[in-house]
Design a protein with these regions (language model features):
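Short beta-rich binding modules
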Residues: 1-135
């Protein structure tokens, strides 16, 4: 079995979840297949219930952090069943010095939209959801 040569650290440890290092500088567009809940181990080592998104194009999933969840809700609404079939553009960003997967936007929105992300004990941040993968 021929394997591809890894070019990013994230590729050394493949797993169930999409990792930002696998994007190789691109912004992939993926179609949401399903949104579910799962018990995942958090950074603190404790099990937490988190949203997990499955996609049509890959068996890899995206664990849903609050920032990405707020962006998806702004684009697609509160009813999760209505997210199925929607396309989402992902990109690699930095968070606490580490690569992180973020939502760039969706070709299913009609124009760029501003989203304010308010997290507990943090200053609100402004994000823009884009219609295309290009900046």
């Amino acid at each position: 079995m021929a394997l591809t040569k890894p070019v990013d650290w994230d590729e050394l440890y493949p797993g169930r979840f999409i990792k930002a290092g696998e994007f190789k500088g691109k912004k992939p567009t993926l179609t949401i297949k399903d949104v579910d809940l799962d018990n995942l181990i958090g950074d603190d080592g404790k099990e937490k219930v988190k949203g997990v998104i499955s996609f049509v194009e890959t068996p890899k999933q995206l664990p849903l952090n609050k920032t990405n969840g707020i962006c998806l809700r702004a684009m697609f609404g509160r009813k999760l069943a209505e997210w199925n079939g929607k396309r989402v553009i992902l990109y690699a960003d930095k968070w606490n010095g580490e690569e992180a997967t973020r939502v760039w936007g969706s070709p299913d929105i009609t124009e760029p939209m501003a989203v304010e992300v308010k997290l507990p004990r943090k200053k609100p941040i402004q994000m823009t959801m884009h219609v295309k993968a290009e900046g």
